[in-house]
Amino acid sequence: SGKIKKQSLHLVVNHWPSRYGGMEKSEPRRMAVAEQLRAIIDSVQQSEPNAAIILMGDFNDDPFNRSIVEGIKAGKNWPLEEGMNFNNPMYPLHQVDSSGTLTYRGKWNLFDQFLLSDDLLKGENKLQYVANSVAIHRPEMMQVGGDGPAKDMPRRAIYRGEFQERGFSDHFPVFMELKLN
């Protein structure tokens, strides 16, 4: 938490419980974290209604999963739909078949996300999200490479329990732009 040009900014970095044991079985753990985070957000928004809030990190759920949509109340549209408190600018990136920040069993997921409070989307605030600036950083050096089906996947630092000298992570990083008005 801090201020930028007198506007309050709260950054909340997340790493939610994994899907170990299966998505359905593990979902209650992520919903519980979403509820705890929701209480923190509600408290901040009550005391600072115009605060800019960025929730970011590895949510271990995709943009359309229950923990994000119902737990955090993050939607894909702006202006925000009724009942939503955050915009998820990552949502359109997940609509592309070969896009995501990680793969599991050959399927792309977008667990690494930014969720933005309404105040970051309004033009009158000092700090503003630059529309359509979110992206997944996927340089070739971070990809498996080659000709096989895994060529576009992240080059892991640890694979099957062994350190890979040329590896990076099992997730690609994400970024976005903010501007000061």
Please provide the spans of the model-predicted regions.
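Alpha-helical membrane segments in multi-pass integral membrane proteins
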Residues: 8-9, 30-33
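Metal-dependent phosphoester-hydrolase catalytic domains
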Residues: 45-51, 61-181
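His/acidic metal-ligating clusters that form di-metal
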Residues: 33-56
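Active-site metal-binding loops of divalent metal-dependent hydrolases
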Residues: 16, 58-59
